[in-house]
């Protein structure tokens, strides 16, 4: 938590709790960062009680404000300006009221409660893919952009690499892709492994009736029980960094293990995802250039997925980097 006060001669007192554990109780008169480590939980809850805005301070017209400048989980922003709520209470001259945001100008309590989107990275081995798992020079993992939806096999980017197998699965999430790739390197050999990853908002969910499946926002699917609540959270708190922060650490651990078995390369066709990978996975494995989908070239027949020329250009771009 990064805090920035603006105060006069009488600074405020703050009492801060993270998931009901008190982490700070004292006066704040200069910028302060508070770091707290805790076991993974399903939600991140922060409460900040602010006092000290006495009638004398109000009458002096001196400022006594605190800005919750940033809240980070695993190094990624949780957007306190969008999801914070301040309940101002016990103030001279003004009524109690609630405001949204990350500013505390009066006495009161600031609260912040967001879901933590953890992922289990379960391998999904029963999905439709172009090739059967086997030893190969280059193993390619991804979603429909790798599988080549609405394209023939020889129009996909893995085909253009040569000596490569296409293990892309339409509609896959990052966690399904990474989980399956992790399983693959435990059971097969490859000289290098390439992942083309989708948006971070695709999450692998579990249902006792459906098993493991991927939620893709705005497709209009119907959900029940726990999955319904998870989907509601994804829609309400859909900031990429907030979504990714819940599973980035576990993903990094799995990528390290994959990279110990083979040369690992990752990239994305989604700008948000590519930005998250660049911020969190540099040094863990090699990050390939962004997959561009230029309007200059014809799309697949559904006019949503990339066409053969997009794939050929991407393969030509990364082939010298992959070597072999």
Residue positions per predicted region:
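Short beta-strand/loop motifs in extracellular/secreted proteins, especially
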Residues: 10-14, 42-44, 67-69
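A short beta-strand element within beta-rich, extracytoplasmic domains
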Residues: 1-8, 45-51, 55-60
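Short strand-turn-strand beta-turns centered on an Asx-Gly dipeptide
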Residues: 17-22, 73-75
């Amino acid at each position: 938590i990064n805090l920035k006060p603006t105060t006069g001669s009488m600074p405020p007192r703050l009492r801060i709790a993270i998931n009901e554990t008190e982490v700070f109780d004292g006066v704040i008169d200069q910028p302060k960062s508070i770091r707290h480590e805790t076991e993974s939980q399903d939600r991140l809850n922060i409460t900040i009680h602010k006092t000290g805005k006495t009638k004398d301070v109000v009458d002096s017209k001196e400022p006594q404000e605190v800005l919750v400048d940033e809240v980070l989980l695993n190094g990624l922003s949780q957007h306190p300006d969008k999801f914070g709520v301040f309940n101002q209470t016990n103030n001279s001259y003004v009524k109690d009221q609630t405001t949204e945001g990350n500013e505390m100008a009066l006495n009161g309590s600031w609260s912040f409660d967001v879901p933590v989107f953890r992922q289990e990275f379960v391998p999904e081995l029963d999905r439709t893919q172009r090739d059967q798992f086997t030893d190969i020079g280059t193993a390619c993992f991804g979603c429909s952009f790798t599988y080549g939806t609405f394209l023939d096999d020889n129009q996909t980017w893995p085909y253009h690499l040569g000596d490569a197998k296409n293990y892309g699965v339409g509609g896959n999430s990052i966690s399904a892709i990474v989980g399956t790739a992790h399983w693959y390197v435990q059971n097969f050999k490859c000289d290098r492994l390439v992942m083309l990853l989708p948006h971070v908002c695709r999450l692998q969910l579990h249902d006792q009736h459906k098993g493991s499946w991927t939620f893709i926002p705005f497709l209009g699917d119907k959900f029940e029980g726990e999955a319904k609540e998870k989907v509601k959270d994804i829609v309400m708190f859909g900031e990429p960094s907030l979504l990714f922060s819940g599973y980035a650490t576990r993903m990094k651990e799995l990528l390290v293990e994959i990279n110990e078995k083979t040369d690992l390369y990752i990239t994305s066709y989604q700008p948000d995802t590519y930005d998250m990978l660049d911020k969190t996975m540099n040094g863990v494995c090699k990050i390939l250039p962004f997959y561009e989908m230029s309007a200059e070239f014809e799309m697949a027949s559904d006019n949503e997925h990339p066409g053969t020329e997009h794939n050929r250009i991407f393969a030509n771009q990364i082939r010298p980097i992959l070597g072999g």
